[in-house]
A protein has these predicted regions:
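Hydrophobic ligand-binding cavity/cleft-lining segments
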Residues: 1-44, 144
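Beta-strand elements of well-folded, non-transmembrane domains
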Residues: 10-14, 53-57, 68-70, 82-84, ...
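A short, structured loop/turn motif at beta-sheet edges
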Residues: 14, 41-45, 68-71, 91-101
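Hydrophobic/aromatic beta-strand elements that line small-molecule binding cavities or substrate pockets
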Residues: 6-8, 37-39, 62-67, 87-94
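Hydrophobic pocket/interface hotspot
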Residues: 17-21, 27, 49, 102-104, ...
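Glycine-rich portal/gate segments that line the openings of hydrophobic small-molecule binding cavities
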Residues: 38-80, 133, 137
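Short, highly charged C-terminal tails/helix-capping segments
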Residues: 135-146
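Beta-strand/loop substructures that line and gate deep hydrophobic ligand-binding cavities in soluble
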Residues: 78-129
Length: 146
């Protein structure tokens, strides 16, 4: 099983970073490997999200159930995709009204050895650069505001 654990301090409110991660539909705008994304609200709260990977000739998709704790965390659990196991959590810890710590943990395992060899390197790159991509997106959004 592969594991990724990242944390970063950012000069943005926890609620703003939560919203950025929660807006799955916006992922194709700033994640270069994301070929598409769609999310539907679930009656019990949270979302079901599908993310399409299209990166260096590798195409795959996965669907997750995301449980949201408004402004604080998003727990991601595999529903469908090329994984035997995928579980992740985003945490947004307020440090002040305008700063927070973002923590991201992900554990995943592909269903077959062949998928691990083909999709594994791409997904490893994605998982290890995920947090940085969201920080860059937050910087771009806040730089554009007057």
């Amino acid at each position: 099983m592969q594991r990724v654990k990242k944390s970063v301090l950012v000069p943005y409110a926890a609620a703003a970073m939560f919203e950025l991660v929660d807006r799955v539909e916006d992922y194709p705008q700033f994640l270069p490997w994301c070929g598409g994304a769609h999310a539907t609200e679930r009656p019990e709260g949270g979302k079901t999200a599908r993310v399409d990977i299209n990166y260096h000739g590798v195409r795959a998709h996965f669907t997750t159930d995301n449980v949201n704790h408004a402004g604080e965390s998003i727990v991601v659990t595999l529903r469908d995709g090329p994984f035997r196991h995928l579980h992740g959590e985003w945490r947004f810890i307020a440090l002040s009204p305008d700063a927070c710590k973002v923590e991201f943990e992900l554990a995943y395992e592909f269903t077959t050895h062949i998928l691990e060899k083909v999709v594994g390197p791409v997904f490893s790159h994605i998982a290890n650069t995920f947090v940085d991509a969201f920080v860059r997106r937050a910087e771009a959004i806040h730089a554009a505001r007057p």
